[in-house]
Every structure is written in C-alpha cells, then in structure tokens.
C-alpha cells in the first residue's frame, strides 16, 4: 500500500481488528501512517502485523537522523480527526502483535515523525501466554524515528505489558533482535511504559542482544509496573544515550537484570561510543544476577 503524493496520509480504520498478511509494506511520501482498530470504542479490536511488514512514512528513507517524515500511529478506541488516542485492545489475544512468528523482521521507519504504539489485552487462558500481552514483538524488529520520538504503551491483565522479543534462534551474540533508535534532540526521545496485573510490566526477553538508543540528546524512560513479579525484566540489553537522561522505573516490583547484563550510557563498538547521560534506576527491589562469562553490567558516561 503506497501513497506517492507528498504529505498524503494513509489511514486504515476499522471498528474491530486490523490484520495484515506477511511481506507487506505501507509507504508514504512523508505523510502519516495510521492503523486504527476498535474505532467505535466498543467491543475491542486488536492490530496484528504479519511477518516481515514494513511501515515507512519517510519516502523510503531509513537513516538514524532523518527529519520531515510523517507520524506512524498504531492504536485504537477514541480519537480525534484521523488519530486514535486510545489503545488497540483485545480480550482474546494480544492488543498489538508485531509479527506472528519467530521468523519475522518488523521494520518501522518514520524519518522524523513521531512513532506511537498503544496496545492493551485482557485475554486469559491462551495456549501461548504471549498472546495475553498488551504489545508483543515476535522475531526481530528495527524501529527508527529519526528526529522524532518513540512512544510505546502496553497493558495486560495476565502477562507482559510490553514484551521484547521472541527470536528465531536463541543466541547471546550476533544481530540485534531489537534495535530501537531515536535522534530527537530534546525532551523525551524514547518512552516505554508497560503495566500488568499479573506479570512483568516491560520485559526484554531471552538471550539475544537488544538495543535502545538515543543518539540526539533526548531522554530515554522505561517505566514498568508488575504485580507479583518485576516491573522491568532485562536480559542482554544496551540502553545508550548521547546526553539525555536514562530513567528506569520498576515500581514496587523493581528491576531485574539477568545473567547477560545491561550496558548504560555508551559502549565501544556500538553507535554510541561516548556519553554524558545521567542514569536513574529506581524500584523497591533491584536484582542483579550473577553474570555469564564475557558479559557485564556497566555505565560508561561522563554524566
């Protein structure tokens, strides 16, 4: 689905679910891309992106510092004009699924436009617990907003508010299975907010490497609320920022760092090799597991 007119938007709006099949693209020439489920705000409606989908609102560009692109919004419920302000929601599955199997590679590029993804699930008793997540990423995902912001909000009644990711093969080296990049220069560049009534708020799953990068000076905030477990669960994650603050709030459930660790600020060999970012990690319970050989927990910053 392609719009070539400069600044023209693509709006896909449904009163129920929205689902795409595999290997499909939605492309605009710097216009907005909006997927709006449950538009009548009655009875719910999820969003499912098929495997290997590409959303690009910046005329095909995919750079780290692009500007001028359109917004990309995945959500549901009430709204104004052509933009939903609520959540894509489901009582029988995940609110939003980014891919449907571990073989997936979801690509989202906004080229300076803001990216907003909101999903909610009240599902219970699913064969696969991951289908009870507010937002769940299957396989690999590359998300770049250029000079725009990235916001993800997920809520779940039973499993993870936001879950990253289910890889094709579980390895603690190799290609990043999550690469989330913003070059917003001020304010909040990346905000991930997840809550669960019976699970982890925001979870970075499995052994494979993942990265969340703020290249332009904006802040990174990860806020997780869990019940009976951690607010934020971390494994083999880089949270890097050139100068904007890095904030992690785990609430009463706290923050759990598993045996492949977490790296804050900057890291040699990454896209950010120097940093002046300040770091705040906050929670009632902060747990750091014994590290596997060759892995580290670190803060590399002059802040």
Name the predicted role of every residue range.
Residues 1-6, 16-27, 32-34, 39-49, ...:
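Extracellular beta-strand scaffolds
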Residues 298-303:
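Short, intrinsically disordered, charge-balanced linker/junction segments flanking boundaries
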């Amino acid at each position: 689905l392609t719009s070539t007119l400069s600044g023209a938007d693509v709006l896909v709006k449904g009163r129920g679910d929205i689902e795409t099949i595999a290997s499909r693209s939605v492309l605009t020439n710097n216009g907005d891309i909006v997927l709006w489920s449950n538009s009548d705000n009655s009875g719910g409606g999820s969003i499912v992106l098929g495997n290997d989908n590409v959303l690009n609102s910046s005329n095909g560009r995919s750079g780290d510092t692009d500007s001028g692109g359109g917004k990309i919004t995945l959500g549901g419920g009430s709204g104004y004009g052509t933009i939903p302000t609520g959540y894509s929601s489901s009582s029988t599955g995940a609110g939003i699924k980014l891919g449907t199997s571990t073989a997936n590679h979801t690509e989202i590029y906004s080229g300076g436009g803001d990216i907003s993804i909101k999903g909610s699930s009240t599902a219970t008793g699913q064969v696969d617990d991951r289908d009870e997540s507010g937002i769940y990423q299957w396989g690999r995902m590359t998300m770049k907003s250029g000079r725009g912001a990235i916001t993800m909000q997920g809520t779940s009644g039973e499993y993870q508010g936001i879950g990253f990711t289910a890889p094709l093969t579980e390895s603690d080296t190799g290609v990043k299975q999550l690469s989330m990049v913003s070059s917003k220069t001020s304010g909040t560049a990346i905000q991930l907010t997840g809550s669960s009534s019976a699970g982890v708020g925001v979870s970075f799953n499995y052994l494979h490497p993942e990265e969340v990068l703020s290249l332009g000076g904006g802040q990174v905030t990860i806020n997780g609320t869990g019940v009976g477990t951690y607010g934020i669960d971390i494994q083999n994650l880089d949270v890097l920022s050139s100068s904007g603050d890095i904030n992690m709030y785990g609430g009463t459930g706290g923050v759990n760092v598993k045996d492949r660790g977490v790296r804050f600020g900057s890291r040699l060999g990454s896209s950010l090799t120097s940093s002046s970012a300040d770091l705040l990690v906050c929670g009632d319970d902060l747990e750091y597991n014994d590290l596997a050989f060759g892995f580290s927990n670190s803060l590399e910053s002059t802040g």
